[in-house]
Swiss-Prot record:
SUPFAM superfamilies: Trimeric LpxA-like enzymes. It is found in: Cytoplasm. Homotrimer. This is 2,3,4,5-tetrahydropyridine-2,6-dicarboxylate N-succinyltransferase. It catalyses: (S)-2,3,4,5-tetrahydrodipicolinate + succinyl-CoA + H2O = (S)-2-succinylamino-6-oxoheptanedioate + CoA. One of its GO terms (molecular function) is 2,3,4,5-tetrahydropyridine-2,6-dicarboxylate N-succinyltransferase activity. The gene is dapD. GO terms for cellular component: cytoplasm.
């Protein structure tokens, strides 16, 4: 089925979702499984960057991910320590893989990384012991470092570095919400969090411990202007605070400078983050 045909079938299944169960057979189940397989293989993604820089969200693909929970029963998931396992509805992306599958996939998966079925991992990616949730997309050359998490349907660009302990939030519901997006060539510092469908635009650097959600003030130090929900391209961002009522300071993210690709290529991350 084409993506257009899958979209039509998924929208129809979504309208009848209360009747979808593990017993569901036929066209509805086939459409759900085909959509999840397309996400898993990278032929479909939950969000796509348009020529104008805006991101188009395929809400129907998110619906397919949610419907996927309805067509499976809970079952044992093998691979735990000392012969133990887990109890879940979603298989590992790597279930049933042999050496040929790994070679074809072209990415590196260090022991104890977890990737759930329907997440796409592009060639050249390195997965340290980390977690990538269902429906996510991790593009070429990206490093997902130790204990980093990529949430459901999150979109991670090319040549991104997600440092140790970074959290990229997942967004499945509410249905109208967009996924969290990290564009190409970004560096996200250790223990930082980007959540709630926020976007970090291309070539940006977040220092260690920067937290950005929809309600986080993002302040440009040079202009004093502040925005929400999006870090502009080429921004260097650190954690900061702003005065509030009654002498109390509240957390914010501070854009301390802007850099272009040429500057990034010649300057270390530590140098960029120094004031």
């Amino acid at each position: 089925m084409s993506n257009a045909e899958l979209e039509t079938a998924i929208e129809a299944a979504w309208e009848a979702r209360d009747s979808i169960s593990p017993a569901t057979k036929g066209a509805e189940r086939d459409a759900i499984e085909a959509t999840l397989a397309a996400l898993d293989g990278g032929g479909l993604r939950v969000a796509e960057r348009q020529a104008d820089g805006n991101w188009h969200v395929n809400q129907w693909a998110k619906k397919a991910v949610l419907l996927g929970f309805r067509i499976k029963d809970m079952e044992m998931q093998s691979g735990g320590a000392q012969g133990g396992g887990w109890w879940d509805k979603v298989d590992s992306k790597f279930a049933g893989w042999g050496e040929a599958d790994w070679k074809d996939a072209g990415f590196r998966a260090v022991p104890n990384c977890v990737v759930r079925k329907s997440a796409y991992i592009a060639p050249g990616v390195v997965l340290m012991p980390s977690f990538v949730n269902l429906g996510a997309y991790v593009d070429e050359g990206t490093m997902v470092d130790t204990w980093a998490t990529v949430g459901s349907c999150a979109q991670i660009g090319k040549n991104v570095h997600l440092s140790g302990g970074v959290g990229i939030g997942g967004v499945l519901e509410p249905m109208q919400a967009g996924p969290t997006i990290i564009e190409d060539n970004c560096f996200i510092g250790a223990r930082s969090e980007v959540v709630e469908g926020c976007i970090v635009r291309e070539g940006s650097v977040l220092g260690m411990g920067v937290f950005i959600g929809k309600s986080t003030k993002i302040v440009d130090r040079e202009t004093g202007e502040f925005t929400y929900g999006e870090v502009p391209a080429g921004s260097v961002v650190v954690a900061g605070s702003m005065p509030s009522k009654n002498g109390v300071n509240l957390y914010c993210a501070v854009i301390v400078k802007k850099v272009d690709a040429q500057t990034r290529s010649k300057t270390s991350i530590n140098e960029l983050l120094r004031d």
